[in-house]
Structures are given as structure tokens and as C-alpha cells.
Amino acid sequence: MVAALCCVLLGSIDLTVVASILPGMIGDLGVNTADIDRYIWAVNGYLIAYIVAIPLIGRISDLLGRQRTFLIALLIFLAGSVLCATADTLGTLVVGRAIQGFGGGGLLPVAIALAGDTLGRRGQLAGIGFVSAIETIGWIVGPIYGAVITNLFAGQDEPWRWVFWLNVPVLLVLLVVLRGFARSSSTGSLRFWRHLDIPGIGLLTIALVTANLALASGGEFGAATGTGLRAMGGTHNPLSSYIPLLLLAAVIATVLLVLWERRSSEPLLPVSLYRQRPFQATIIANLCIGAVLMVTMVNVPVIVALTTDADDVATLSATLLAPYTIAVAAASLLASRLSDRWSERYLLAGAVILAAVGALLIALLQDRDNHWTLVPGLVIGGIGAGLLLPALGTVPIMVADPRHRGGAASSALMFRLLGMTIGVSALTSLAVRRLQSLSNQLEPIVREPDESTASFLARQQTFILDHAIPLSIQVIEETFLVAAVIAIAMLPAIWLIGKFIDHRHEIEVPAD
């Protein structure tokens, strides 16, 4: 079980590890920083594959056997890590990240199921909670881990590759350990595929991919040629002309998925849970907090990349994110103690307000000449998020009957990840569109016929410093304002969750 938890931790670390190393990655791969709607897929590719893998691999483990399925997921994660480490184009990197994400996402539900199988019915709840906590710790420390590794290998060319190369020996050791354990374990039928909800997983994948393609590409929709980001040296997004069709495909796939899951004898998702109001509230809250978390994890390194020397980006990004991640972790640990003293409704409502205030402070206090002005907002926002996460993970387990607790825990995490991927796609699109609007009057950077290369590059650099960077930072500040609004929007759902927990406490600990 310890080896399985190590695998889950590694998979969740890679969820956010690119946050601090993304600027270096796109620079080494020759991607223009203006093409954010393209390179954001190094994040989205992992998240979408991770989400799809959770219900699919979880179901396969029921049919094929836990250990065998876990080893397959581990091998997929290993293959993705190697592909990321050797990628020489953005497309290859995105494919590698997607393969990684599918393997990493598959590790989580199998580990949760293993915890239930190993610990028995009495220890099931604690085991599921512990696996979920390990997964949360992983994506919290991911950006810091990425920066530490790139600093350790700073003398090497393209040190970010070592973040993925170091996965290989660790995974090989874990494979040997787990393979020995799997030999002594029973396995399921090799005809497992007959019992899989293939239409369900297909519709879920189509809905996620098309929705995110549309959202991430929406910033350029309707923009004139040579304006906005294109004036800053970015390239045309070929999908921008197909956004209505992509959105239509996403809506149709989602509707068909809901209809299919209602009628399926072996649904991909635990349909009965979705009828319960506390679970519905956790879906909304997890979607919102996922978006808020990812805005912070991605945009802080982007601010640093825009205003700092390239060699210092990873270190400074991790240094700034450290207070945020520490605050999230510390508040998560304190949440249970605080809930013993205070009403859960007021505690969670206060946490929402803290998350919103933190995002507001980042937007209002950000100073490109002094990055430390970000820290107060990061700490306050981290405390708010940390106080929310335990409740959002435990309520689905409390609602579900013992047979469905693993599926409930996986579903809660899946919707948080869905919030991350939709949030980063939608806010990226809004940011690009806003930047298009702000920079619409800028003349494109075009080399004159008789202009020397040195003169053109100098003019381009001046343009970037005087126009592109200030406008980009302004837009990023505005995304934090949107994040604050998203945080406040989940207040009704959070209040319902707090009310449910308070009611359960009253039943379990009746007044004297």
C-alpha cells in the first residue's frame, strides 16, 4: 500500500509540476509566449486525461483486478514521462502529458479501491480520506518540486527535462515492488472490456476535449488579422474559426452522456449520488475551487516570467507559490480542529471570503517591480482554499453508502480537476480576448524591407517592454478579479455543505 501511495503522490505532483517550469519549457521548445492558447495544453492535456482515467481505470480495476490494473496505469505513466522528457516540439510534449495524465489519473481510483480492500469496512473511510489527502498534497507541492529539480540541474541544458527523467528510476523501482505483490494477488477476467461503459467514456472524452478546445481558442474568435496577440508575434489559432461547432459538439456530447448514464446498467459515474443535494453542492464547490486554485498556480509563474530574467523564473515562481501551498496545507490540517469549535457553515463561508479576498489582493497589490506584494494575497487565499478542501472531499463520502464511497471520493476529485481544466481554459480565453481588445490598436511588428536584423530585434524588444508586458500583466490581474467572483459564486453551495455537516454532527453528538 505504501508503494501505491508513492505512485499516487508522483502522479498528483505532475498535475501542477509544470506551473513553475512552463516558461522555460516553452522557451526551449521555441514557442512564442503570445501563443498561450496553444501551450496551455501542456497543462490541459494532463488534466483532461487524468479526469477521463479516474472513472474508466477505476471500473477496469473492478473487472481486471486491482494490482494488474495498477501496474498497467503505472506503465502508461512511465511511458508518458519518457515522452515528455524527450519532446522536441510542443505537440509531442502535449501528447506526452496526456499519456502521463491518463496513467496518473488511473492510479488514484485503484489506490482508493485498494485502501478499501486492504483496510476492510471499518477502516475504509479513513483509508479513502488518506489517499485523497496524499493526492491533494501532491498537486500542492508540484510547483515547488518542479523549481527545486530545475535548480538542481541548472547547469544542464534544458533542466526542466529532468523533472520527467527522474520519474523513470522511481517508477521502475515501484514497478518491481508492486509486480512482486501482484503475482500473489488474484486477478479478474481478461474479458473485462465487455462490462465497460464504452459509450459513456467516449462521450465524456468528447465533451471534455471539445469544450476545452473551444474555451482555450475563444480569445481570438472574431479578431481582425494582425491585431492583438498576433501583433505581438503570436500565430493564428486555426481552431478559432470552429469554436461554435466545438461548443455545439460539447453540449451534444454532454446531453447524450447524461441520458446514457441514466439508462446504463453499468454506469461510468455513480448516478444515484448526483440526485442528493449535498453531493450536488460539492460538485459546484469543487468546480469553483478548482478554477480558483489553477488560476493561482498558473498565473503567478506567468507574472514572474513576464517581469524576470529567464534563469530566475522557476526559482522565484516556486518561492512565491511556497507561502500559498504552505497556507493551503496548514489550513487543511487545522480545518477539523476548527470545525469542532465553530459551526461548519460559518467556518466554510469565512473560508470562501478569504479565498475571494486573497484573489482581490493579488489583483490590486501586484507590482511588477516588487513581486513580494503578491504574498499577502497568496497567504490569505491559500488559507481560504485549505479550509475548504477537507469538507469538499469528505462530504461525498459521508453521503455515499459504503459500497460507493470509493466512487464518491473519486467523483469529488474529478470535479475539482474538471474545475481546474475548464477554469484555466475559460480564463485563458477571456484573458486572450481581453488582451486582443486592449492591444487592438497596436501596429503589427513587421520587418521593413531594408531593416537589419539587429534593428528589427531591438524594435521588437522595445515594443514588448513598452506595450506587450504591461498589457499582459493588466490582463492577468483581471483574471484574479474573475477568480474572486468565482469564489463568491460558490457561497450558496458552501452554505448548504456546511449545513449538512452541522446536521450530521448534531445527530452523531446529541446535546445533553
Pin down the residues of each PLM region:
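Membrane-interface helix termini in secondary transporters
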Residues: 24, 55-59, 63, 148, ...
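Hydrophobic transmembrane-helix bundles of small-molecule transporters
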Residues: 152-284, 471
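Transmembrane-helix exit segments and adjacent C-terminal regions of multi-pass membrane proteins
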Residues: 1-6, 182-187, 240, 256, ...
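Cytoplasmic loop-to-transmembrane helix junctions
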Residues: 38, 123-130, 316, 404-411, ...
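Helix-loop-helix hairpins in multi-pass membrane proteins, especially solute transporters
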Residues: 62-200
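Extracellular/periplasmic helix-loop-helix junction of adjacent transmembrane segments
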Residues: 21-52, 315-319
